[in-house]
């Protein structure tokens, strides 16, 4: 494995961040492996959302730092992400803006044809690609779950901001207090110590003098 030169997670991540500008990305590098006596290292990255990606799954393939531009559907990487891995298991919508980036570095890349346009489906390479892709998809799943929970919290806070002031004012009027309760801290606001004063609604009652007959 000392003879191999992978991109590394930092360099691969920097490239994804620069070119795709994603909302989220994750990269991983698998331990060295071998097929037919030839060592290789598998690197996989995933990017989600952002300004560049559109809806649907996209695959970017590299071999020994050289991009592979043709015959994508014949590549073992496409077989892995389209047939071997179910995106629904990771709660990723089918139309999600997602890109998978694969890089194989080896002393002998297992090209299937002399044109060197796509990789053959070697079991060892397929195994490493599958495990690396699953790892980055799990990280994406955690991100999407956190994002979904934050959206739920945001919707709840919007409802609270709309109705809590009305509830507080109604409760103050019903109790006859002069000040409303300090409810704004529940909304995450900072200028919360200001209390709304409720005008006194006491009506003056004229003195009634009883006449003694």
Name each model-derived stretch.
Residues 1-43:
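Glycine/threonine-rich ATP-lid/beta-loop region of ATP-binding domains
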Residues 47-185:
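Charged regulatory segments coupled to nucleotide-binding catalytic modules in large multidomain enzymes
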Residues 1-17, 160, 165-193, 212:
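Gly/Gly-Pro- and Ser/Thr-rich, intrinsically disordered tail segments characteristic of DNA damage-repair
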